UniProtKB/Swiss-Prot annotation:
Keywords: Aminoacyl-tRNA synthetase, ATP-binding, Cytoplasm, Ligase, Magnesium, Metal-binding, Nucleotide-binding, Protein biosynthesis. Belongs to the class-II aminoacyl-tRNA synthetase family. Phe-tRNA synthetase alpha subunit type 1 subfamily. Its EC number is 6.1.1.20. This is Phenylalanine--tRNA ligase alpha subunit. The keyword Hydrolase does not apply. It comes from Rickettsia typhi (strain ATCC VR-144 / Wilmington).
């Protein structure tokens, strides 16, 4: 009995002085482990002949074991609380320290320009249509009245991909006119929408990049004529540049998908040079035929513009390639604040 009380007192003294969980675990093994002090006492049962003595001794050993276990358990709780308090003290936040400056992102000039262009067309009742970047030869060329030997179909102008769709070559769309074809095939006239998005051509210099952004517009209805086209283009240009005095001229041109076709030039002031900004024309009858629209009942006009071109003119950016270089200094100079998004109520932005 005296030996059991001595073991309990020794355990209490040692565990009381422990300051970390690692040392506590070592004492647990020392007293309750396979070769520990309490286990060694328990082995003495085999030397006792009297059954009653064995029973009483076994009960005392088990009681000792439970007491030491409870002491260790209580110490574990104390040490864990101490560790948590130390961690909280080390991690506490000083509310008097000035906060780090919040870094807010900004709007890329192409995104800003795209938003402004869309808002202008929204004033004229245009909706938005979207389509895939990967197209087949039919939607990108054939349905738009491109001849099979047209230079635009060549590898040096178009990015062709491996694989085919409905036995037609796959490619990265070279214009968003593909969206017009899909929309006309899947819907019924009248139509009045724009198709903004990325386009791809094998070209790279100061005025061309392999990937660029376009907005193409389409209007299909009864009794549509060139006068409607000119009205929309003139109103659009003057609204976007916020200059009612911009001069415009329509030059005869050629596009496979429009007839007659024109290119539009502008100049801000009388002494400025004329600058080409977009192409347009009346939708070619073959295009209407290819999408199942009655050419004798419906007519329409289409136009297409490069978003980068309009951004360069409006924001006075000289080199097209700078849009895609990721130069932080350049982006900080030409960026737009997130609250500087155009809206119909507040008008256009800088």
């Amino acid at each position: 009995m005296a030996n059991i009380e001595t073991i309990l007192k020794l355990a209490e003294e040692k565990i009381l002085l422990v300051h970390n969980l690692k040392d506590l675990q070592e004492y647990k093994v020392e007293f309750l482990g396979k070769n520990g002090i309490v286990t060694s006492e328990l082995k003495k049962l085999s030397s006792l002949v009297n059954g009653q003595e064995r029973k009483e001794f076994g009960l005392k050993i088990n009681t000792l074991k439970d007491k030491i276990h409870n002491i260790i358990k209580a110490k574990v709780q104390i040490l864990e609380e101490e560790e948590l308090n130390l961690k909280l003290a080390a991690d506490k936040i000083d509310l008097t320290i000035p906060a780090r400056r919040y870094k807010q992102g900004s709007i890329h000039p192409i995104t800003q320009c795209m938003d402004e262009l869309i808002q202008v067309f929204a004033q004229f009742g245009f909706t938005i249509e979207n389509g895939p970047n990967i197209e087949n030869d039919f939607h990108n060329f054939t349905a738009l009245n491109f001849e099979y030997d047209h230079p635009a179909r060549q590898m040096h102008d178009t990015f062709y991909l491996k694989g085919r769709e409905n036995d037609k070559p796959l490619l990265l769309r070279t214009h968003t006119s593909t969206v017009q074809i899909r929309a006309m095939k899947n819907g019924k006239p009248p139509f009045r929408f724009i198709a903004p998005g990325r386009t791809y051509r094998s070209d790279s210099d100061m005025t061309h990049t392999p990937m660029f952004h376009q907005i193409e517009g389409l209007v299909i209805d009864k009794n549509i004529n060139m006068g409607h086209l000119k009205y929309v283009i003139i109103k659009f240009i003057r609204s976007f540049f916020e200059n009612p005095n911009i001069e415009l001229r329509f030059r005869p041109s050629f596009f496979p998908f429009t007839e007659p076709s024109a290119e539009v030039d502008i100049r801000m002031n009388k002494n400025d040079k004329w600058l080409e900004v977009l192409g347009c024309g009346m939708v070619h009858p073959n295009v209407l035929k290819n999408v199942g629209i009655d050419r004798s009942e419906y007519q329409g006009f289409a136009f297409g513009l490069g978003v980068e071109r309009f951004a360069m003119l409006k924001y006075n950016i000289k080199d097209l390639r700078r849009f895609f270089e990721g130069d932080i200094r350049w982006l900080k100079h030409y960026n737009f604040e997130s609250f500087d998004i155009p809206n119909l109520a507040g008008g256009l932005t800088k």
